[in-house]
Every structure is written in structure tokens, then in C-alpha cells.
Design a protein with these regions (language model features):
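C-terminal motif of bacterial Sec signal peptides marking the signal peptidase cleavage site
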Residues: 6-10
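Sec-dependent signal peptide recognition
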Residues: 1-2
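Short, charge-rich amphipathic alpha-helical segments embedded
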Residues: 63, 73-91
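Amphipathic, heptad-repeat alpha-helical segments
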Residues: 12-43, 47-50, 90-91
């Protein structure tokens, strides 16, 4: 699959779309888990990276957009994990 993608021209938008969808999902799950209150650094950083990814994509800078989307995905997952841990430690159930 990778060899096929390398051979294609203009695959940046496709790769960005895949990463962006994953990042958006991770951030949305973190929000649902209460990450804005329980893991604010990771949550708001993920939002910022996702916004920057969208901005870079809009300008046609897909390599940068992909990197920002991947970072947003990572931080969104961290925010989700921390929010769940904080909820469990606080006696709440998800």
C-alpha cells in the first residue's frame, strides 16, 4: 500500500484527510470524557494542533498539515486517557 501511495501524485490531501479524521475523533472522544476539565493541557493542545492542521491544509501545505494532525491525534488520545484516569480516581464512572 505504501509503495502505491508513494507512486501517486497528489496523495497529500488523501493522507491528510485520513489523519485529520482520526485526530478529530480522538479530540471529540476526549471532550466527551471531560478532558477540558480533567486534562486541560493535552485537550487544548490537541485542539490547537487540529486547528493548525486545518489551516495548513487550506493553504495546500499537506506535509505540515499531516504532522499537525498526527500530533493532535496523539494529544487527543493522551487527553482521553488522562480524563478517564481522573474520572476513575475521583470515584466517577464512565
Amino acid at each position: 500500500m505504501c509503495a502505491l501511495l508513494v507512486g501517486l501524485t497528489g496523495c497529500g490531501p488523501f493522507l491528510y484527510a485520513v489523519d485529520s479524521i482520526g485526530a478529530g475523533s480522538a479530540v471529540a472522544q476526549a471532550e466527551t470524557a471531560g478532558a477540558a476539565d480533567r486534562a486541560p493541557y493535552e485537550y487544548y493542545a490537541a485542539l490547537s494542533y487540529l486547528e493548525k492542521a486545518r489551516e495548513e491544509s487550506g493553504e495546500g501545505h499537506y506535509d505540515a498539515a499531516i504532522r499537525y494532525a498526527q500530533r493532535a491525534h496523539d494529544l487527543g488520545n493522551r487527553a482521553l486517557t488522562r480524563a478517564r484516569e481522573a474520572g476513575t480516581a475521583g470515584g466517577e464512572r464512565e
